[in-house]
Amino acid sequence: MTNGFHIRYLQRQEIDIARWDDCVGRSANSLIYGFHFYLDAMTAGQWDALVLDDYQAVMPLTWRRKGGVSYLCQPAFTQQTGIFSPSAITPGLTDAYLQTLIRHYRFAEIFLNHGNAHPTLRTQVNLVLPLSDSYPVLESRYKKDLVRNLRLAAGAGLV
């Protein structure tokens, strides 16, 4: 138990895939990078996980081994991983995950997703478009030039 959170380290073969994908899919910060099929494809199944309680929050741990030392790394074509949860991810939860992570790996070079805030982490520019609103609401925010260009493209049969 770390900071009041019960986080378990699971090896790939111990993970309940249906519950894993359900947790990632229902997360407000859901990304394809967190689903098991993507992780399996990008790491040849060489990933483990940190799981909170009964899959309330999950974090994939993509690892490699060099010189007998296991370390965390970002897989190719994977912008970000980190913690996925349908509930709010607090800095306290992020801290508990990081504390659990450092007990298992001596070195890590990973990029957490935009939903994993923590005061001690270095942030990078990450352009995330919030597209959860309906299309008419999104369309109402278009600039006049874009609306004009879309109308012209539709008139020319391009869209």
Residue ranges and their predicted role:
Residues 1-15, 117-159:
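Acyltransferase donor/substrate-recognition loop-hinge adjacent to the catalytic core
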Residues 5, 15, 22-25, 37-96:
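Conserved donor-binding loop and adjoining core beta-sheet/short helix segment
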Residues 23-26, 41, 97-101, 130, ...:
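Residues that form generic nucleotide/phosphate-binding pockets
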Residues 26-27, 45-46, 104, 155-156:
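Structured helix-beta-strand junction loops
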Residues 29-37:
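Short Pro/Gly-enriched beta-strand edge/turn motifs at strand-loop
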Residues 36-41, 113-117:
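Short, solvent-exposed loop/turn elements at beta->coil junctions and helix N-caps
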Residues 64, 86-88, 113-115, 130-132:
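Beta-hairpin (beta-strand-turn-beta-strand) motif
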Residues 90-126:
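Non-catalytic accessory segments adjacent to catalytic cores
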